[in-house]
Amino acid sequence: MKAMILAAGEGTRVRPLTQRMPKPMIPVLGKPVMEYLVEQLADHGFNQIMVNISHLAESIEGYFGDGRRWGVEIGYSFEGYLDAGSTIAQPVGSAGGIARIQDFGAFFDDTFLVVCGDALIDLDLTAVLRRHWQSGAVASMVVCDVPREKVPSYGVVVS
């Protein structure tokens, strides 16, 4: 199965930490947040992972490489452009990262999962997929309620 990890953001809410490392690389109990995600994806049968990167991209790509260490294949989609031989990061936001999926049409030819690279998820991904398939829906989204006063600290889903 296939998954996409959104890991291109600048992590402005946790500066100054993210001036030196991208948010998915912030260590929790000795390893980067995103490593927990890669392990969880592998445990649930996701063996091909596309990661969109931008801010300090080389840190993520250098650490995770081709994914072999976790028994998965990892590919990268860089958000930015080349200027005189240098790569210039230019993140386009979560929606932009997901929109770029079109650039990898052959990669995303079946059911796939999109997760944020800076979030620890306590969720049975196999059960989520099973429920999605049973529903017959084109797309499913897993979200949680957040108290109104905490909304500014989280992403917002308008339904």
Regions found by a protein language model. Name each.
Residues M1-S159:
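Unchanged
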